[in-house]
Amino acid sequence: MINNFLIISCIGKDDKLGLRINKEFFVYKYEKKEISRESLVFYIQNFLKSHKVKLDEKFSIIVNQGPGSFSGTRISLAVAKGLVISKKIRLYGYKDEDLLEFNLKNIEILMKNKLIEKKLIKPIYLS
């Protein structure tokens, strides 16, 4: 079961970060239209720091695999994989069409319906 997690949705439309920690859920919406690797890392660091989150092997990252922006999807995956390697946390992915609305209730439905995949990553790009 995925308990505490960071969810990254950076596919070029309504980009957001979500954080579930100790049964609470927080959302951060990007202010920029285009996301860069540096800005995504900055947003994630500040978001985790503001909620006093410590990344460890019990923590998970869930990434939106698209379809969506090629660069946004690749940046999300690269940043997530970097955290996985450096912090030994678990990585999961989901398809954008499976998450009807970016909130905890719908994310938990994804988990319950086994629509979050551990076999990553097969991103879907729009061209």
What role is predicted for each listed range?
Residues M1-F42, S50-D56, I89-S127:
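Oxyanion-binding and handling regions
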Residues S69-F70, E101:
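Short, active-site-adjacent cap segments at secondary-structure transitions
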Residues K32, G68-S69:
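A generic structural signal for short
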Residues K13, G66-P67:
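Short glycine-rich anion-binding loops that position phosphate/pyrophosphate groups of nucleotides
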Residues S60-Q65, S71-I89:
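DPxDG-like acidic metal-binding loop motif
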